[in-house]
Amino acid sequence: MKKKVLAAVLVAAVSMSMAGCGSKQAESTDNGSKTESEAGSDAAAADSGEKKTLRVGMECAYAPYNWTQSDDSNGAVPISGSSDYAYGYDVMMAKHICDELGWDLEIVKMDWDSLPTSVSSGAIDCAIAGQSITAKRLESVDFTDPYYYASIVTLVKKDGPYKDAKGLADLKGATATSQINTVWYDTCLDQIEDVNKLPAYETTGTMLVSLESGACDLICTDQPTAMAACVAYPDMEMLDFSSAADNYQVSDEEINIGISVKKGNQELVDDINSVLEKMTKEDYEQMMNEAISVQPLSE
């Protein structure tokens, strides 16, 4: 879920940049399975005062939120069951949460679509994976407060036919796509008049390659993902219509990024929120900018 960026993200494609968000299918190095005895041991450890280990699931292929790299540079964390390491905004946030709460951290790499079921089954404690807090997801998992506030943007080629677009009306008739199971694909693209909507892509990397190769005119994504893409692909340009009335219409819940936990696990939600409430949007932006600045451009 690299040839060009987005460490793990763009790896699948050549290899990738943030709400909400998207869908991506990466090769799993750990199926995230936790036996009942292991789960019981975790609970016993917590009850006895032993240091808790937070098992965090993510795709490790969705830069700048998370990616895979071959060493521990910049503070990357080992991926469970693998010789590789994970880093990115999500890993930085997971480390910060565990540092504040005095917990150990374990990163579990898994396919994007398996995250909700892994959270629900208790195979992982939570998913910190760039997931937007949608009503559909809230049917199966609970969410913390947002740990990033994403905006939706459009990616085009600098020399493409829509490079001068100032709003959605200027995108009329465009051939467009995005990632599967995202608000970008399910909600936003249909707001473009006469859009030629291609099938959704499984990964961020393949989505970006479709634009780079000319298979589509534009893709819809979140701002961090687009920013990282522009680092990987200098011939791409991000169009932000947020200051115009003619913009994608979505709710805050659809683009705010949260940490998913098992339904009913209010204790974990409260613990994580106790860390997030001490942070500001400026803290999030600073952390995201750092992630974008160190994302691998090749692997």
Identify the residue ranges that each predicted region occupies.
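Ligand-binding clefts/hinges and TM-proximal coupling segments of bilobed small-molecule sensing domains
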Residues: 45-46, 183-201, 238, 270-299
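Bilobed "Venus flytrap"/periplasmic-binding protein-like clamshell domains
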Residues: 60-63, 83-99, 131, 153-208, ...
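Acidic, polar ligand-binding/catalytic clefts
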Residues: 104-170, 246-252
